């Protein structure tokens, strides 16, 4: 069994360099919620140095709230903004002798696209227009995954080690209790269960089916690095190969 382990980078976290030694894919902020041209270049160089797959992490234009504010934008606006961000990172990767492999939306853009077919379509269309060989990463079972499949893109269904789930397989909103899994043992058991059995227990006690092709670990938590090391070791103990 194989699993991809991904982390968001270029968002101002001091742990980026250490995380790159543990993950197989990096989602690099493209300036709309965090980062700038210099951090994008630095992140690409670090990813290449560590043999980590490079991906774009486009967002709503919301630096003030780290891309976590809900927005109502026209699909064509989202298409243009997504194309702009992923095109910039693709150019930087190419200039450094690398290749951008995937796209994973950030924050509220990711969450809204999981449920909004028009928004999901705009993102998938932009990814396809930029490069139809790119992998589109989205929440397992979401509208974004369906939109990617509609455009013939390779999709990668994502689960989260440190997020609570609702009975329908969606994430608990960050504004609600249970959104974050702060107990390390719980997070480890939840992640292994999703990867090995394709199920996750919701905060209300029901079991939801999920497809786990990539696991997101966040680098901004208090014990993020220690947990990432534990999770990687647990995968290796079970002969689960970590690869993009």
From Swiss-Prot:
Its EC number is 3.5.2.9. The keyword ATP-binding applies. Pfam families: LamB_YcsF (PF03746). GO terms for molecular function: 5-oxoprolinase (ATP-hydrolyzing) activity; ATP binding. It catalyses: 5-oxo-L-proline + ATP + 2 H2O = L-glutamate + ADP + phosphate + H(+). The keyword Flavoprotein does not apply. Keywords: ATP-binding, Hydrolase, Nucleotide-binding. One of its GO terms (biological process) is carbohydrate metabolic process. Signal peptide: none annotated. Catalyzes the cleavage of 5-oxoproline to form L-glutamate coupled to the hydrolysis of ATP to ADP and inorganic phosphate. PANTHER family: 5-OXOPROLINASE SUBUNIT A, UNCHARACTERIZED PROTEIN YBGL-RELATED. Forms a complex composed of PxpA, PxpB and PxpC. Belongs to the LamB/PxpA family. HAMAP family: PxpA. This is 5-oxoprolinase subunit A. It comes from Citrobacter koseri (strain ATCC BAA-895 / CDC 4225-83 / SGSC4696).
């Amino acid at each position: 069994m194989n699993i991809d382990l991904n982390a968001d980078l270029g968002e101002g976290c001091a742990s980026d360099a250490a995380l790159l030694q543990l993950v197989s894919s990096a989602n690099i902020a493209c300036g709309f919620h965090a980062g700038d041209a210099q951090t994008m270049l630095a992140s690409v160089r670090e990813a290449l140095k560590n043999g980590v797959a490079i991906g774009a992490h486009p967002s709503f234009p919301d630096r003030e709230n780290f891309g976590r504010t809900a927005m109502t934008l026209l699909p064509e606006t989202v298409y243009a903004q997504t194309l702009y961000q992923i095109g910039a990172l693709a150019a930087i990767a190419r200039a450094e002798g690398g290749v951008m492999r995937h796209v994973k939306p950030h924050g509220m853009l990711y969450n809204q696209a999981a449920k909004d077919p028009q928004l999901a379509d705009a993102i998938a269309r932009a990814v396809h227009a930029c490069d139809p060989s790119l992998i589109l990463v989205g929440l397992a079972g979401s509208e974004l995954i369906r939109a990617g499949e509609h455009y013939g893109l390779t999709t990668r269904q994502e689960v989260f080690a440190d997020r609570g789930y609702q009975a329908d397989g969606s994430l608990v909103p960050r504004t609600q209790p249970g959104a974050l899994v702060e107990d390390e043992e719980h997070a480890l058991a939840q992640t292994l269960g999703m990867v090995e059995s394709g199920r996750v227990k919701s905060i209300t006690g029901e079991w939801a089916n999920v497809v786990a092709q990539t696991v997101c670990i966040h680098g901004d938590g208090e014990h993020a690095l220690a947990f990432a090391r534990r999770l990687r070791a647990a995968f290796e103990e079970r002969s689960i190969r970590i690869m993009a």
